[in-house]
Structure formats: structure tokens, C-alpha cells
């Protein structure tokens, strides 16, 4: 089977690939473009002053033909988990990385980590595989294997430079998300962990739309204890409920500071309104646990090492492992 490295052209101008061969756009898409494949193409507010309006209105509409292909490609994955946060900076991607390391520590599990933070990908750096490339064969795209039983996929692997910016609007993001779901050869996985950007944006709407038929186990929501983070988490939970996404539970990250020397713990971000646990009781969702802040987590993330393996006795490690057990119980895996 022949393979070749995925070219950076894949991430340069992908919009045209979602159009039928006989159509072409006259101008770049405007901000808030619903995408030429959308039911709202040519009808949305953003379309009214767009030069492509007539083209998009004339495109054939109907069920997305890629969704059955996505469902088939993901049929070998037992559990699909979205990692969400209402606000950036709460450690969502860091927790996604630690969750992936923790699950793959079980040699009997096959794990995939998919980075959907398209404009700010960070999983490859934290997993220690930034120098790897994605290969394409006649069966599809091969993800990068961090370990024998841990595969990763990110746009970062396809960028010409580590610090290259991805300046895309919704429809370009949608195309890449489709490719990650339809064309990546994930094979049989026990878990696919999906890291998403903060908030409720195009990526969240698209991943839910494209994966709904294949079955999403649910969302793991990450927050920090202070009220300003909880305010946005409430919006994230509201989004999940309106979108029909099951909420597996909430993790309170950075709930205290652990001194690496004395192992003493002190509060950095005070839970002024009761923190994540109180929020879970109020909203009737499962509280998966609290994870304290250990400064060595940042160092391990920077160096692409597993904090759980490097510091197995840290209170943060023990807390993460407890959360993983609660999560596995929530999806019926233990």
C-alpha cells in the first residue's frame, strides 16, 4: 500500500472542495457565511450582500451525503467523548491530554485524540509529537501514533510552520472536521476523545451534526472554581441541552495548588459561589471530581511528557485517575 505525506495545500484553500465540479465561487466568503452546502446558503443575513448569493442559492439541497460515510468510518469506535469548556484558559486541552494518557495507560484500550481547536491546536505539542506528519494512502489519512495504543489527529501536523496561523471562517472549518471524521483511518478504538475550542462556536455545532448518527456518548465539561468561569460553563451546559448532547459530567480543574515539596494544598481560585460541585447540584449533572494545580503539569505539557507517568504520587495525578474512573463508569465501561 503506497502512502504520501499530506500536503499543506490541504489547509490552504479548501472551500472549493465542498462545491460540485460545475460550480465555482466568484468572491471570498463573508463573515458568518453559513457555507455553500448549508440549507441556509444564499438565504442567511450574511448572504444578502455577498457576490456568491445566486450561486449558493442554486446549489442542490438535501441530506448531507457525507454523514453516512462518517457514520460508517466511526462505526468501530465504542465511546466518543467531547471535551468542552465555556471559557478559555481553564485547562481543557491539558485535561484532554491527561485523559488520553490515562486511558492509554491501560494496554487493553485503544485510544484516539482528535484536536478540533482548529485555530489554536495544542494537542500535538502536549503529546510530544509535533514533528510527526500525517500520511495518506488509498484507505484514507493515517493518524499520528503517540504510543502503540494512542493515536492523534490535528491540523497542526499539516501546517507549513509550527507558528503558522489558521485564519478560517466556519465553512472551511466544517470541511476539515468532515475530513477528520470521514477520511482518517481510526480503525477500532475504545475511546475517541475530542478536544474542542472554548465556547459554543462552529466547531461544536458541526461536530454534533456530523457525529450524531454515529452516537456521541456525551460531553465532559471542564471549569475552574471561580464564578467568572462558572458563568460561561452555564452557557456551555445550556448549549449541550439545546443541541441534545448528553452531559457526562463536570470536572473542576485548578481547584487548589499543590506544593511539589511539602505536598500542601492551598486555594488559588476561590470558589466564591460554591465552585463546580455546587453548580452540578444546582443543575442536576454529575460532578466527576476536582483536580488540583501542580506546577509540574505545565512543565510536562511543554515537554510533551505524560505528567501521570512522571509524577504518579502527585495529588493531581490521583485526582485525574479518579475522574477517569468516574468517566468510564458514566459511559458504562466499568
Swiss-Prot record:
An example Gene Ontology CC term for this record: cytosolic [4Fe-4S] assembly scaffold complex
Cofactor(s) the protein requires to work: [4Fe-4S] cluster
Keywords from the UniProt entry: 4Fe-4S, ATP-binding, Cytoplasm, Iron, Iron-sulfur, Metal-binding, Nucleotide-binding, Nucleus
Annotated residues for binding of ATP: 86-93
Xref: InterPro entries: Mrp-like_CS, Mrp/NBP35_ATP-bd, NUBP1/Nbp35, P-loop_NTPase, YlxH/NBP35
Free-text comment on the cofactor: Binds 4 [4Fe-4S] clusters per heterotetramer. Contains two stable clusters in the N-termini of NBP35 and two labile, bridging clusters between subunits of the NBP35-CFD1 heterotetramer.
Keyword Nucleus: yes
Compartments where located: Cytoplasm; Nucleus
Residue positions binding [4Fe-4S] cluster 1: 33, 47, 50, 56
GO MF, any single term: ATP binding
Residues reported in the UniProt entry to bind [4Fe-4S] cluster 2: 259, 262
SUPFAM superfamilies noted in UniProt: P-loop containing nucleoside triphosphate hydrolases (SSF52540)
GO BP, one annotated term: iron-sulfur cluster assembly
Keyword Nucleus among UniProt keywords: yes
Oligomer and partners: Heterotetramer of 2 NBP35 and 2 CFD1 chains.
Cited function: Component of the cytosolic iron-sulfur (Fe/S) protein assembly (CIA) machinery. Required for maturation of extramitochondrial Fe-S proteins. The NBP35-CFD1 heterotetramer forms a Fe-S scaffold complex, mediating the de novo assembly of an Fe-S cluster and its transfer to target apoproteins. Required for biogenesis and export of both ribosomal subunits, which may reflect a role in assembly of the Fe/S clusters in RLI1, a protein which performs rRNA processing and ribosome export.
Family label: Belongs to the Mrp/NBP35 ATP-binding proteins family. NUBP1/NBP35 subfamily.
Protein name (record): Cytosolic Fe-S cluster assembly factor NBP35
Native source species: Candida glabrata (strain ATCC 2001 / BCRC 20586 / JCM 3761 / NBRC 0622 / NRRL Y-65 / CBS 138) (Yeast)
